[in-house]
C-alpha cells in the first residue's frame, strides 16, 4: 500500500462512525479509494443523501438552487470529488446541524467531516479515475471546465507564513514538506478547482487565534482543522506586516546615523572647525564692546554700520558705547548700557569659525548667563582693570567670581582671562596693576577647579581701541607683555574632540514661531541631516527636521556637533516646548527622570542643607525646582572617602552625596556618560550655593 494511501487511511477514521456507510469505509480503508468505488452500494448510499437534500430542512433547502449546475449531475458518490467535501464545506456545517437527529449521521460532523476534508487536501493518486468511469451525469472534465468559468473572477488570496515574526501558535500544524510538481492532466484539473475553493476555506476566525510567547515551543497535536490552519496563515501574515514595519524603522534609524567622515565635514566648511566662545564678567567690564570690536576687526560688521552706530550713540549721549551696540541690539539694552539677554554673533578667521555668546553681567540675569555658558566651548572672562571697577566686580561680591564658578560647572574647561581697559588713564598699561589682578584671579580659579598652567591664560587688552584683540599689543605701550593676541591664541589653541558619529543630542536653548516651530541650541553630540526623524524628550514626541540654519542664517543640509543651529521641526507646536527639552536620537534617547544620586560641593550657604531642602537646579539649558530628599554620605577633604553614616546636615565647604528629586521630569545623563548633561548648579535666593554632578540615575 502506498504512503499516500496510508495517510488517507488515517484520515478516514471519521467515516467509521458514519453508520450508513460503514461497509464502504471498511473497503475504503483496506483498498484505498479504488476499492471503495467498486462497491455496488455506493451509488445507493449517495442517492440517500441526495434525497435528503431535496427535503426542505434548515439551511440545506437552499443548497440545490444555488449549486444546481454542479450538484445535480453527481448521481454517484464517487463522482462528487471536491464538490461534496471541500467546496460545499459551508453547507455541510448547516447540514450537520439539522441532521443531528439522524442516528446514522450523529458523529459525522465531529470527526468524519474533518477527516474527509483532510483527505481532499491531500489529492491522492488515482482519485479522479473513478469519476471518469461513472455512467451517470456529465464527465468530471466538463464539470471542472464549467466550475472554472464560474469561479474565474474570484482571486485567490495569498497569505505567506512569516517565520521571522517570532509568533507561534498553540496547536499549530507541523510544516509539511513541499509537494512535488504533478504532471498528470487530471490532477492539474483537480488542483485548479481546489484553488477556487481554497479562497473560502482560508477565511480566518479571529476568535480562534491563540498566540504563545516566542520562547515557548510549538505544541504537537493532532491534525488541525481548516479554521485553525487559516487562522495560522492570517496571524502569520499580520506578524509579517508588523515585522516589516519594524524593519523599516530600524533601517531609517540606521540610515540617519550612518557614520560621517570627518574629512568630509572639514571640506564642507573649508577646513575650518567651529568654536563657541562666551564673554563673561561683571557688569560694565566691557564685554559687549569687546565683542563688537572683534566683529568689526574680522570684517563681520562693515565700517558703514559701525559709523551709523557711532552717530546714533553720540545723539543718544552714549558716544563711548557705540561698539557695544553691535552686540546689544535691544533698545532697552542700548539705553541702559547693559546686556539683558545672551547676545549672539558670528565671525570667521583664516583658521576657524566662531560664535560669540555675550552673557549679561548683572546678577539679575545669572540664569541667562548659565544658559549661555552651557553652550560654550571656551570662556573669556573679562576683567576691568580700571580702579574701582575691578574691586567692585571681584572683591565686593560682584559677578566675576560667580561667573567663573558657573562657567566651570557648565563645562567651560578652557578659560582666557583678559584684563581689559588697560588703556584707561587710571591704569595706563601699568604692569603692577596687571599683576595684582592676575594674582588674585589665579588663586580663585585654582579653588574653582581650573588647572591654571594648562587651561588658563592671562593677557592685557583694550576692547575699545582693539589693542591686543587681533594684533599684538604695541611694544611702545606695553613692553612687558610679549604674548599672543586674543584671536591669535584662539586660532591656535587645541580644542576638544568632536563626537560626530555619536548619537544625536541637542538641548533646546530657545524656541520661536517662524513659518512653523523653530528651536535653537548647540549640538552636543552626533550630527543631523534635513529630513531626519528625532525624538523630543521628555515628551517622547517624534519630530522631523524640515530645515537646518547655521550660524550665518544660511540653510544647510547637515550640521555636526559643536555647531550652534536653528532647526525648523515638524510634529510639535511651539507652545509644547520649553527650554531644557532635548532633541535626541530615537535609537538612544536621553534619560527622562525625577530622581538621581549626585555628588554635591557646597560653595556658598548661609544656613545648612538637610533632608527636605529645596532650591533651583540649572542643568544644561534646563531650570528645575528640586528637593534634597536624603543625605547619603559625607566626603572627607582631600581623599573624598565616604562616611559610613549619613550626615544629619551639610554646610558651606562640605562635599556630600545625596538623593535629589525634581518636581517635573528632566532630561539628564550621568556625568561619566555625558558630562554636558550630567553636571548642574544649585541656586537659592539669587545666589549659587552648590555645584554637582550626577553619579547614578534612579528609577521613577
From Swiss-Prot:
Xref: InterPro entries: EFTu-like_2, G_TR_CS, GTP-eEF1A_C, P-loop_NTPase, Sup35, T_Tr_GTP-bd_dom, TRAFAC_GTPase_members, Transl_B-barrel_sf
Binding site for GTP: 281-288, 358-362, 420-423
Region (G2): 337-341
A single GO BP: nuclear-transcribed mRNA catabolic process, deadenylation-dependent decay
Location relative to the cell: Cytoplasm
Region feature (G5): 462-464
Annotated segments matching region G3: 358-361
Pfam families to which the protein is assigned, alphabetical: GTP-eEF1A_C (PF22594), GTP_EFTU (PF00009), GTP_EFTU_D2 (PF03144)
Composition bias, Low complexity: 114-123
Stretch list, region G4: 420-423
GO molecular function, one term: GTPase activity
Residues found modified as Phosphothreonine: 355
Top-rank taxon, per record: Eukaryota
One cellular component (GO) term of this entry: cytoplasm
Alphabetical UniProt keywords: Cytoplasm, GTP-binding, Nucleotide-binding, Phosphoprotein, Protein biosynthesis, Repeat
Transmembrane regions: none
Region (Several sort of repeats): 10-136
Start and end residues of each tr-type G domain: 272-498
Biased composition (Basic and acidic residues): 179-194, 204-221
Segments for region (Disordered): 114-250
Segments for region (Charged): 137-267
Segments of this protein annotated with the region G1: 281-288
Stored PANTHER family: TRANSLATION FACTOR (PTHR23115)
Family affiliation: Belongs to the TRAFAC class translation factor GTPase superfamily. Classic translation factor GTPase family. ERF3 subfamily.
Function noted in UniProt: Involved in translation termination. Stimulates the activity of ERF1. Binds guanine nucleotides.
Protein name: Eukaryotic peptide chain release factor GTP-binding subunit
Species whose genome carries this gene: Kluyveromyces lactis (strain ATCC 8585 / CBS 2359 / DSM 70799 / NBRC 1267 / NRRL Y-1140 / WM37) (Yeast)
Amino acid at each position: 500500500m502506498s504512503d499516500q494511501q496510508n495517510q488517507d487511511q488515517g484520515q478516514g477514521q471519521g467515516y467509521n462512525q458514519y453508520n450508513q456507510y460503514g461497509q464502504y469505509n471498511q473497503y475504503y480503508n483496506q483498498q484505498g479509494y479504488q476499492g471503495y468505488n467498486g462497491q455496488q452500494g455506493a451509488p445507493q448510499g449517495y442517492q440517500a443523501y441526495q434525497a435528503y437534500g431535496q427535503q426542505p430542512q434548515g439551511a440545506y433547502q437552499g443548497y440545490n438552487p444555488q449549486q444546481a449546475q454542479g450538484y445535480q449531475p453527481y448521481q454517484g458518490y464517487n463522482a462528487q470529488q471536491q464538490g461534496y467535501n471541500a467546496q460545499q464545506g459551508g453547507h455541510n456545517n448547516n447540514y450537520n446541524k439539522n441532521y443531528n437527529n439522524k442516528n446514522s449521521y450523529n458523529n459525522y460532523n465531529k470527526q468524519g467531516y474533518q477527516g474527509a476534508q483532510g483527505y481532499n487536501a491531500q489529492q491522492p493518486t488515482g482519485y479522479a479515475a473513478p469519476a471518469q468511469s461513472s455512467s451517470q451525469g456529465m464527465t468530471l472534465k466538463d464539470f471542472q471546465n464549467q466550475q472554472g468559468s464560474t469561479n474565474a473572477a474570484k482571486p485567490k488570496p495569498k497569505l505567506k507564513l512569516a517565520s521571522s515574526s517570532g509568533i507561534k501558535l498553540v496547536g499549530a500544524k507541523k510544516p509539511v514538506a513541499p509537494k512535488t510538481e504533478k504532471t498528470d492532466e487530471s490532477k492539474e484539473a483537480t488542483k485548479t478547482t481546489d484553488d477556487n475553493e481554497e479562497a473560502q476555506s482560508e477565511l480566518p476566525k479571529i476568535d480562534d487565534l491563540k498566540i504563545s510567547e516566542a520562547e515557548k515551543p510549538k505544541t504537537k497535536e493532532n491534525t488541525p482543522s481548516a479554521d485553525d490552519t487559516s487562522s495560522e496563515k492570517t496571524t502569520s501574515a499580520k506578524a509579517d506586516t508588523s515585522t516589516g514595519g519594524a524593519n523599516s524603522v530600524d533601517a531609517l534609524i540606521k540610515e540617519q546615523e550612518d557614520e560621517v567622515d570627518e574629512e568630509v565635514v572639514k571640506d564642507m566648511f573649508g577646513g575650518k572647525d567651529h568654536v563657541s566662545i562666551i564673554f563673561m564678567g561683571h557688569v560694565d567690564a566691557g564685554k559687549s564692546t569687546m565683542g563688537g570690536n572683534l566683529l568689526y576687526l574680522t570684517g563681520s560688521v562693515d565700517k558703514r554700520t559701525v559709523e551709523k552706530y557711532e552717530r546714533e550713540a553720540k545723539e543718544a549721549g552714549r558716544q563711548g558705547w557705540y561698539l557695544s551696540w553691535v552686540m546689544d541690539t535691544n533698545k532697552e539694552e542700548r539705553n541702559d548700557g547693559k546686556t539683558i539677554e545672551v547676545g549672539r554673533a558670528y565671525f570667521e578667521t583664516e583658521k576657524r569659525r566662531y560664535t560669540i555668546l555675550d552673557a549679561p553681567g548683572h546678577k539679575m540675569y545669572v540664569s541667562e548667563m548659565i544658559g549661555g555658558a552651557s553652550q560654550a566651548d571656551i570662556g573669556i572672562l573679562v576683567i576691568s582693570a580700571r580702579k574701582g571697577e575691578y574691586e567692585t566686580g571681584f572683591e565686593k561680591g560682584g559677578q566675576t567670581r560667580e561667573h567663573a564658578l558657573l562657567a566651570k560647572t557648565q563645562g567651560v574647561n578652557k578659560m582666557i582671562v583678559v584684563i581689559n581697559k588697560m588703556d584707561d588713564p587710571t591704569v595706563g598699561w601699568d604692569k603692577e596693576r596687571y599683576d595684582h589682578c592676575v594674582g588674585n584671579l589665579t588663586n580663585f580659579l585654582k579653588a574653582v577647579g581650573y588647572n591654571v598652567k594648562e587651561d588658563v591664560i592671562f593677557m592685557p587688552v583694550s576692547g575699545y581701541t582693539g589693542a591686543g584683540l587681533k594684533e599684538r599689543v604695541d611694544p611702545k605701550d606695553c613692553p612687558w607683555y610679549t604674548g599672543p593676541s586674543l584671536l591669535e591664541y584662539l586660532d591656535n589653541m587645541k580644542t576638544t574632540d568632536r563626537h560626530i558619529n555619536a548619537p544625536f543630542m541637542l538641548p533646546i536653548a530657545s524656541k520661536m514661531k517662524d513659518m512653523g516651530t523653530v528651536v535653537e541650541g548647540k549640538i552636543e553630540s552626533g550630527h543631523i541631516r534635513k529630513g531626519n526623524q528625532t525624538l523630543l524628550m521628555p515628551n517622547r514626541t517624534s519630530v522631523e527636521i524640515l530645515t537646518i540654519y547655521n550660524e550665518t542664517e544660511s540653510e544647510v543640509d547637515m550640521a555636526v556637533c559643536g555647531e550652534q543651529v536653528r532647526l525648523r521641526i515638524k510634529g510639535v507646536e511651539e507652545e509644547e516646548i520649553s527650554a531644557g527639552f532635548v532633541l535626541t536620537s530615537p535609537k538612544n534617547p536621553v534619560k527622562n527622570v525625577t530622581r538621581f544620586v549626585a555628588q554635591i560641593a557646597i560653595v556658598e550657604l548661609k544656613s545648612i542643607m538637610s533632608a527636605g531642602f529645596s532650591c533651583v537646579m540649572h542643568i544644561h539649558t534646563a531650570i528645575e525646582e528640586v528637593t534634597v530628599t536624603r543625605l547619603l554620605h559625607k566626603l572627607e577633604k582631600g581623599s573624598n572617602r565616604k562616611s559610613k553614616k549619613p550626615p544629619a546636615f551639610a554646610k558651606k565647604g562640605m562635599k556630600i552625596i545625596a538623593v535629589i528629586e525634581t518636581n517635573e521630569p528632566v532630561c539628564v545623563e550621568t556625568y561619566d556618560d555625558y558630562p554636558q548633561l550630567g553636571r548642574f548648579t544649585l541656586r537659592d535666593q539669587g545666589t549659587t550655593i552648590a555645584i554637582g554632578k550626577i553619579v547614578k540615575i534612579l528609577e521613577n
